[in-house]
Amino acid sequence: MAKPILVTGFEAFGEHEVNVSEGVAKSLEGESVRGHYINSLILSVDYEGSNRVASILDYEEYAAIIHIGLAANSSHPRIEIRARDILDFKVPDNSGRLVKKSKISGLGDLYSTIEPNDWDIKTMIDAPVVSDDAGEYICNETLYRTLMKINDGTPCFFLHLPLKQDDAKGLVLQCLDRMLRPACIDVGAGALIQDGKFLAARRSQTEKHAGWWEFPGGKFEDGEDASMCLIREIKEELDLDIKTGEKVGEWIFDHGDVVVRLHVMECFVSGGKMKLHVHDKVEWCDGPDEVNWLGPDRDIAEAISARLKHHRR
């Protein structure tokens, strides 16, 4: 049986009559992400609550852990990637505890076990931001104590929510999906430009994703950057020698069984005669809607189309 996911929220505290994180956590109970069911837990806003998950980890294992809490002064959700080794309460916790300028362990700051650079955050609900300051209150203490106990790489972080958010539940589900999906594979994608047009190549019937159109390229090999990868891959796929130009951008796409980070660069033919090895057709395009693109390649084609005016004589 697949390990469960743990999502925690907090009860109300201080001047707040409700805590948005409590309702969000409760709403996720029993939901499933990539075959893992969610268990929800509401924590008290005190030492016992901050240490509860760390104690549970003595006898339970989870596929992923998200702590959710309220950041009343934030305008955007915050993905916290660091738990600071300090407590300095501005108000007492719900047990009356008021800790001032105190270390949690004395061992230094701890870092969340996630890779937000692989998450394509700009496409996520309500535009979350990555933060390295979880504060000096119970939220920070809870994340710190949980991270102290994790020794197997279980993905875990703290999500701070603003007072008002349109779809906090949807955002948490997006975070969990990214925590559990495969790590990104770096792939080069070449925007071959010639005579004011760019090249699209159709995958042959013997290839994965047969019949779909893409930009030529492939996976980085050890020690390669995007330019080196594309020079090698386009030679292998099309028998063309190329020079790389400006970087167009990066796109992350989840194919289900694999997640790729596409590094897209302008490319220019410098030699060779085109011969197709993994494709069965090519088209020179001057817009994004001339072929049926694979994955995010239509968005890439749109970005490249906007640049073509700089390459027309």
Report each predicted region and the residues it spans.
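N-terminal catalytic or cofactor-binding beta/alpha core of small enzyme domains
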Residues: 1-136, 146-152, 156, 170
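Active-site segment of metal-dependent pyrophosphate-handling enzymes
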Residues: 235, 239-271
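Conserved N-terminal beta-strand and adjoining loop/helix that marks the start
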Residues: 182-199, 219
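Short, well-ordered beta-strand micro-motif
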Residues: 160, 192, 264-268, 284
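Active-site-adjacent mobile loop/cap segments within catalytic or ligand-binding domains
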Residues: 138-180
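NUDIX/MutT-family hydrolases
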Residues: 266, 275-307
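Charged phosphate-binding loop/patch that engages nucleotide di/tri-phosphates or the phosphate backbone
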Residues: 165-182, 296-313
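Conserved Nudix-box catalytic region and its N-terminal flanking loop in Nudix hydrolases
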Residues: 197-236
